[in-house]
Amino acid sequence: MKALLSLLLAGSLPIAALAGAKIPAGTDPKLVALLTARDESGKAVIPEEELTYFASLNDRLRELLNQAVQKEVITSAAHLRTVLGLQLRPQKMELLLQNNCALCHSDPEVQSAEDLFSLNPAAHGAPSHMNLKDVVEDVHFRSGLSCAGCHGGDPTAALGHNFVKEWPEKERGRNRAWIVGFCARCHSDPTFMHQFNPALPTDQFAKFKDSPHGVTLLVRHDDRAPQCISCHGVHGIRPAKDPQSRVYPQRVPETCGACHANPKTMAGFTQPDGSSLPTTQLAEYKASVHGQALLGRGDLGAPACNDCHGNHAASPPGVASVSHSCSLCHSANASLFDGSKHKQAFDDHNWAECSKCHGNHAISKAHDSMLATGPGGLCGDCHRQYAKDHPECVMTANYFRDTIGQMDQAKGRLITVSEKLAAKGLDIEPINNHLTELTDALKRSRTYIHSFSRNTFEQAAAPGEEAIKQADTLVEKARSEYKFRQIGLAASIASIGLLMIAIYLKLRQLEK
């Protein structure tokens, strides 16, 4: 390397010849030496792809690279390969090249494995949070907030920083309570935060302090409780709307489950009734109708943990607040239930409204068999225990189930008939219009079950029953039309046949 550099400085070797004309003229000879370096086997340290990327850099970025090499912030070809291997867009590359902290800590010849930023931390035995790819995608880095914002010091200086005074003492690595206050220095300051995102709230710390997580961490000093980096990460913090963010909707269950699905972490924590806090929530959620929608089908409208429990003020919904959580999405069901007789009964027994019938984390898709009044049926089992003197309830539940069953059966029958009529070339649009009305009425009827009122339910079901009648009438008309077409076709074929016979006989007569 030294011999090559000497030749370059002496002008004995043309720079372009060393890199296939991919290194622009004017590049500092020291930088060229790194770009063209070879390992002991003679293989180029900087791959062609990274050389091509270097050649695409604008003058400003090449000058910053020249300066980094001249100041010996970038000292080796391996170090340069790491920087170029990121292949960042110009804005991010400029931020990186002006951050001596990140540059120095990505030098494998200077840093220990524990302190080395690299493109593959596991390969170097470094912690996962030392991934340089995460650093350059971090929301703080992209906003121009450098390492010094948390660690202290001056990122434009090579050394001489004062982060030792600003960064918490080593013993704080065993006490995580300081982290929330540390992050709150900025995130609780509206004036500071509004420079970057005016819509971002600044009350996270205030909410966290009073939450079960906050009380466990700050009052009980139990480090098993999560703090900011438990959910958001360390150097790879991304906006919640970024699919790679740990708090992106589809990743929230995994993030919460890191603690709540770990028996060791959750050992000793109890519910309000004194029972142990379960660790089955994540598995139950994944199998639930909500989990399948969010994780299976990618429906971001489906709720994750934080939609029901909250974020920084996360807490288990109490009996009185469960319905309010559910009503954020299921507003019609909640409104109907509030006006029903069941509302008072649930209040009297101190039952959580929605979860009493549907469950919480293991919510399965609601089905009509839930209305069964026999043994094992949801309605039947509850009413046998709590409403033995109300036989009209059983009659109402049976009516609900029978009516919905008849409409559902009619829907399936009409779909099959409609497809057969379409295959015969008949116009089925009027029938399908009534099918749409029936489908809407069926959905509405299932919602109106939550009124637990026969009269209210009948109002929702009536349009569906009428749609069945109208559709059946149109089906009969279509069948009659098809029969008429068949008769007409047969008559036409017969007429044509007779005509052909007559012509044949006439031709025979003429031949004679």
Where does each model-flagged region fall?
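Short sequence/structural segments immediately N-terminal
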Residues: G20-I501
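Positively charged n-region of N-terminal signal peptides that target proteins for export
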Residues: M1-L4
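Bacterial N-terminal signal peptides
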Residues: S6-A16
